[in-house]
Each structure stands twice: as structure tokens, then as C-alpha cells.
């Protein structure tokens, strides 16, 4: 896309434009297509219904202007009630693990824990909007085809924002996507980003899932050299030293 989503935010607020008005800038008369068509879904949890029955599609869009029109007319992520979710996925991909585009994939997970309650709304809105602009604006470069969609889960115990990718085995691709995500969301080095495999999440027996990849909070302490031939790295080096975990995750 030649013009970024952020640069075109003002275009969405222009309303109907009179084409005969010579004073109207030409860019306000032009719609700016996105590379993909996107679907926004909403879910409000109801224990009396099946999960899929609670999931509703809100809208489809494929231009910058329609993106901002939709975003500006729905409740912000920070304003959603507990138990609510937003899902933004490429058209044709359902926001569920079982979808053929997601079943072999995983997600990068950003947690806004309850200890940050005082700035929770601001932080959640920032993470969600920056993530939306990054995916619809194709800011992941050549890795955009691996991206399926984004999710925000609003929970009293702690909110979650996640980016779903289609192939959990491509550690190189997912690591790079995670690095871009960290930069786009301005996530500080004190926060740890986790990449979780959907199959591990669906089969979990506890509240936590061992991540396949981590972007560590800080670089590990350097290893002391024992001699010229010493090449030993810290135990479990894949996660902390390089940002990747062993090739085969442990459930």
C-alpha cells in the first residue's frame, strides 16, 4: 500500500465530498485500497450459549477510509465490558483455532496485567490500535502472508492482545514478526513477548502454556570464558540468548 493507514486517518473523517468543489484536495476524492480485505468480529461471552454462537461478524472493509470509519464508530478496546473480544482477521479466516488457516499456527501474546489497572485503558487502546494499523497497513513486509489476524481479549484478571500467524513451525518468520510487533507497539524491554502454538493452547491442562519462542525482557548475563576453547552458552540458550526456543515445544 503506497500510503500508510496512519497517514490517511484524516481522510476517513471527511464525510461526503462534493466532486464539483474545486477546493477539495484530490486525495479526499480517492479511496485508498488495502492489500487485503478484513473482517471485524465481536464476541460477548455467554455461559448459556456455545462459543461460536456468541461470535458475530461486525463488518468487512478493504480501504483505509472504511477502516477508520469503522474504528471511529465502535467501542474502543479499553471500553469493552469484561468477557468481550474483538477479532480482526483476513476475509475467509474464522477467528478460531480449528480454521484451516489457523490450525497449524500460533500467536504472539501481549498481556496487560491487572497490576497496571491505573493506565490499563490507555495501554490497551494503544496496543490494539497500533496492532490494527500494522496488520492492515502491511507493515510486516514479506512476512505479511503468514499473518492471519489480531485479537483483543478483555478480562478482569488481565487483558490480552495477540497476533495470530499461520505456521508455528517457521521460527525464523515468527521471530521476525515478533520483533516487528515489539517495535510497532513500543513494548519496553521489561515486558516479555511469548509465541504460543495453538495446538498447545487447545490441549493445555493449566492456565499457562510453554511458549515456543520468547523475546526476552533483557539480555542474559554474559558467559564467563573458561579458556580459549570455551564455547559453552547458558543452559537453555535458545530462548534467552537468541529469542528462540528449541525446535520442538514441550506441551
Swiss-Prot record:
Gene Ontology BP, a term: piRNA processing
Subcellular location: Cytoplasmic granule; Cytoplasm, Perinuclear region
The keyword Protein biosynthesis is assigned to this record: yes
Gene Ontology MF terms in the entry: RNA 7-methylguanosine cap binding; translation initiation factor activity
Keyword Plastid assigned: no
Documented effect of changing residue 58 to A: Abolishes interaction with mxt
Chief localisation class: cytoplasm
Keywords, sorted A to Z: Cytoplasm, Initiation factor, Protein biosynthesis, RNA-binding, RNA-mediated gene silencing, Translation regulation
Tissues expressing the protein: Highly expressed in the germline (at protein level).
Disruption phenotype: RNAi-mediated knockdown results in maternal effect lethal (Mel phenotype) and masculinization of the germline (Mog phenotype) phenotypes. RNAi-mediated knockdown results in defective activity of the PIWI-interacting RNA (piRNA) silencing pathway.
Biological role: Recognizes and binds the 7-methylguanosine-containing mRNA cap during an early step in the initiation of protein synthesis and facilitates ribosome binding by inducing the unwinding of the mRNAs secondary structures. All 5 eIF4E proteins bind monomethyl cap structures. Only ife-1, ife-2 and ife-5 bind trimethyl cap structures which result from trans-splicing. Translation of trimethyl cap structure mRNAs may be regulated by intracellular redox state; disulfide bonds change the width and depth of the cap-binding cavity determining selectivity to mRNA caps. Ife-3 is essential for viability.
Subunit details: eIF4F is a multi-subunit complex, the composition of which varies with external and internal environmental conditions. It is composed of at least eIF4A, eIF4E and eIF4G. eIF4E is also known to interact with other partners. Interacts with mxt. Component of the pid-1 variant of the PETISCO complex (also called the pid-3, erh-2, tofu-6, and ife-3 small RNA complex) containing at least pid-1, tofu-6, ife-3, pid-3, and erh-2, which is required for the biogenesis of a class of 21 nucleotide PIWI-interacting RNAs (piRNAs) that possess a uracil residue at the 5'-end (also called 21U-RNAs).
The protein, known as: Eukaryotic translation initiation factor 4E-3
Species this chain originates from: Caenorhabditis elegans
Organismal lineage: Eukaryota, Metazoa, Ecdysozoa, Nematoda, Chromadorea
Amino acid at each position: 500500500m503506497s500510503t500508510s493507514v496512519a497517514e490517511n486517518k484524516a481522510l476517513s473523517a471527511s464525510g461526503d465530498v462534493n466532486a464539483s468543489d474545486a477546493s477539495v484536495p484530490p486525495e479526499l476524492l480517492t479511496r485508498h485500497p488495502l492489500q487485503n480485505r478484513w473482517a471485524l468480529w465481536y464476541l460477548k461471552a455467554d455461559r448459556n450459549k456455545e462459543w461460536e454462537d456468541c461470535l458475530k461478524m461486525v463488518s468487512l472493509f478493504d480501504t483505509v477510509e472504511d477502516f477508520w470509519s469503522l474504528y471511529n464508530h465502535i467501542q474502543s478496546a479499553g471500553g469493552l465490558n469484561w468477557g468481550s473480544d474483538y477479532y480482526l482477521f483476513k476475509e475467509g479466516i474464522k477467528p478460531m483455532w480449528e480454521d484451516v488457516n489457523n490450525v497449524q499456527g500460533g500467536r504472539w501474546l501481549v498481556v496487560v496485567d491487572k497490576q497496571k489497572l491505573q493506565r490499563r485503558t490507555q495501554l490497551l487502546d494503544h496496543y490494539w490500535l497500533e496492532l490494527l494499523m500494522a496488520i492492515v497497513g502491511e507493515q510486516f513486509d514479506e512476512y505479511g502472508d503468514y499473518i492471519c489476524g489480531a485479537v483483543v481479549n478483555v478480562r478482569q484478571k488481565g487483558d490480552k492482545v495477540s497476533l495470530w500467524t499461520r505456521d508455528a513451525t517457521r521460527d525464523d518468520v515468527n521471530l521476525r514478526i515478533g520483533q516487528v510487533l515489539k517495535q510497532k507497539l513500543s513494548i519496553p524491554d521489561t515486558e516479555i513477548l511469548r509465541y504460543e502454538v495453538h495446538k498447545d493452547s487447545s490441549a493445555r491442562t493449566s492456565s499457562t502454556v510453554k511458549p515456543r519462542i520468547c523475546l526476552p525482557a533483557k539480555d542474559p548475563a554474559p558467559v564467563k570464558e573458561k579458556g580459549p576453547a570455551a564455547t559453552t552458552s547458558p543452559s537453555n540458550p535458545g530462548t534467552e540468548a537468541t529469542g528462540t526456543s528449541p525446535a520442538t515445544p514441550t506441551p
